[in-house]
């Protein structure tokens, strides 16, 4: 099953000084042949975080972050997933599971993965609580860290 990499996992893969860089690389090396995806939201988030000096000590300019993103998505087995999810429509999102503003983007990225018949790969265990029925977290969320 193709895995949609969330922003945190993309950042961990790209930045050698990230605390989970080795773990992310190990997971990626073992799993990328099954296919891996990005979407508009994860690509934009990657550029935003990669060019934010408050988040990353070696942040780059947006232009440099875009160049890095292009190199990453140029790696083998990548697919780009369109995002046609309307959060207002409620497709693939169980609003009863949303309890805070920080869950909105996670739920949206999870919804994109479900729309495309895939799963989400993340460093964030909290995403498992957002999985809507009839799916199971074990089926559609891959938490890369132990």
Residue ranges: model-predicted function:
Residues 86-99, 110-146:
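Acidic, PIN/NYN-like endoribonuclease modules and their adjacent C-terminal/linker elements
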Residues 16, 37-44, 66-98:
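Acidic catalytic patch
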Residues 31, 72-73, 113:
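A generic structural signal for well-ordered alpha-helical segments
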Residues 24, 105-106:
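Amphipathic coiled-coil/heptad-repeat helices and related helical stalk/stem segments
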